[in-house]
């Protein structure tokens, strides 16, 4: 997915909280033709996005890709099973951002100590480079900052 084409494509963003809203704005900024939005709970309207009230509506739409917010559990999720049945590729908002980010990436995973480790690495990198972005699931969505990255950036 490193060369993900966004221009003139149709997307579904599944999960419309902070990260989902950021993904919608990012997709439109990169020339997406249509962006549908869906959330298992209540979600606000987003300008230019088309809200789906029923996930089964994806059967009648020509969706190229689905972007998942971090809160969407893929295991045992009937909506994800439908995407797979319809051969609609899906990825996280974070992966979407990584496909378009310039520069280098530092990714931290694990069970304990992620926030402390992230803050420590961020502070260390900032002493050497002023193009360091702190983003991901805990703070700022990656799609909120990726349009500001350069080849010298570190995410």
What is the meaning of each model-derived region?
Residues 1-92, 96:
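N-terminal leader/targeting and accessory segments in enzymes
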Residues 10, 58-61, 74-155:
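Phosphate-binding loop of NTP-binding sites
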């Amino acid at each position: 997915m490193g060369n993900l084409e966004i221009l003139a494509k149709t997307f579904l963003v599944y999960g419309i909280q902070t990260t989902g809203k950021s993904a919608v704005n990012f997709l439109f900024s990169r020339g997406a033709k249509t962006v549908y939005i869906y959330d298992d709970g209540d979600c606000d309207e987003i300008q230019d996005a088309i809200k789906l009230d029923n996930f089964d509506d994806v059967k009648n739409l020509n969706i190229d890709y689905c972007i998942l917010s971090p809160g969407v559990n893929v295991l045992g999720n009937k909506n994800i099973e439908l995407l797979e049945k319809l051969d609609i590729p899906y990825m996280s908002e974070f992966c979407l951002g990584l496909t378009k980010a310039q520069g280098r990436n530092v990714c931290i995973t694990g069970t304990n100590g992620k926030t402390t480790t992230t803050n420590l690495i961020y502070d260390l990198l900032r002493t050497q480079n002023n193009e360091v972005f702190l983003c991901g699931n805990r703070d700022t969505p990656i799609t909120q900052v990726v349009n500001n990255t350069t080849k010298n950036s570190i995410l």
